[in-house]
Amino acid sequence: MPNCCLKLYTKKESKMNKLNVVCGALVIDGKVMIAQRNYGSSKGFFEFPGGKVEKSETKEEALIREWKEESDIDIHNVQYLANSIDYQDGYEIHLTCFTCTSNEKPTKLSVHSEYIWTTPDHIYDYNFFKSDKMLVEALKGVWPCLTKPMKPKY
C-alpha cells in the first residue's frame, strides 16, 4: 500500500475560498473564557475569541493581534491546542486553536456581546458550533495540565 495521502473534495468544497483562522482559549484562575458573537450568521453562538490570519503573520502573531484588537488585552504563553475545519458562508475555514494566559481580564466588547468564565465541566451549558465543540473536547483533554502546577518527578 502506498504511503501517501489524498484529500478528495466535493464540487461544493473545491469552489470554496479557504480562510486560515485562529482562536484562543484564555485560561485564568482555573477558568476559561468564552465569548458570545453579536452579529452575522454566528450571532448568539459562543466561541474562543480570535480571527483571520493575515499573509504577513504567523498564527501566533495573528492570535495576539486579534486579542489586542477585540479585547484590548495582551495574551502570552500561547500554546497550540488543536485544529478544526468548518464550512460556513461559502468558506472552508481552517481553524487553529491555542491556549493562552494573560495578566488581565478583558472588559472591552467589540464583536462579542458578552464574556463568560467557565470550566470544561460546564462549557456545554453554552451553544457552540460543531467545529468549535471539537476544540472544546481538546481543551477538556489538557485541562488538568493547564490548571494544576506541575510537580517534579523524583
What is the predicted role of each segment?
Residues Y126-F129:
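C-terminal structural segments of small proteins and small subunits
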Residues I73-N83:
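A short coil-to-beta-strand element that immediately follows conserved catalytic motifs
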Residues S84-P106, I116, P120, D132, ...:
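Active-site-adjacent beta-strand/loop module that shapes the phosphate/pyrophosphate-binding cleft
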